[in-house]
């Protein structure tokens, strides 16, 4: 499964940004079918707005992807200590290229697995996880590792596909997206995610739009 994920993102690196930013006509159709017409760009803006530009702590961005959504935000976060991790080396190289072009110097990048984060407990003040939790093969381990490395009082900020909201989206996720290696079952519903979060976090924001969930939760 891990090799399939790597190869799928290697294959898609030439059109990945157009797909997720709705830069082409076909990507607009993709979002209408998969996400129920939700504007992923707007949801990303809302999630990133939860992080102040003058944030001074340590933040983990996993998976960073190509940093197509985050580069402009990170240019403004000059006082933050940011670590960007991705399982796909191809995605990571594109993110690094963007960061260099933007002159960002307060970011460390590394290839790694969210299910085995190479960090001590209570390392990060914030963890940002955009478009990742529908991809990670071992979701239990991903949540566990994020919880372990997040400080008490730190925030987990996330957005991702959830099951049970849109029939067409669920069909596409289970068939085409899974077959291509871009999504990995099983997929949580909104209620599943609440059950994961509530024992360990105070849920500050929790929103479902189309087949996408985005939330902000503070570790107890």
Q: Where in this protein do the model-derived segments appear?
A:
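A generic alpha-to-beta junction signature in SAM-dependent methyltransferases
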Residues: 51, 76-77, 150
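C-terminal alpha-helical "lid/dimerization" subdomain adjacent to the S-adenosyl-L-methionine
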Residues: 31, 157-215
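A short glycine-rich, Lys/Arg-flanked "PGG" loop and its adjoining helix->strand segment in the class I
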Residues: 140-152
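A short SAM/SAH-binding and catalytic strip from SAM-dependent methyltransferases
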Residues: 126-138
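C-terminal lobe and adjacent flexible extensions of AdoMet/dcAdoMet transferase-like proteins
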Residues: 216-220
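A short acidic, Gly/Pro-enriched loop at the edge of an enzyme's catalytic core
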Residues: 115-126
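Class I SAM-dependent methyltransferase SAM/SAH-binding core
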Residues: 58-116
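Conserved class I S-adenosyl-L-methionine
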Residues: 1-53, 68, 72, 174-177
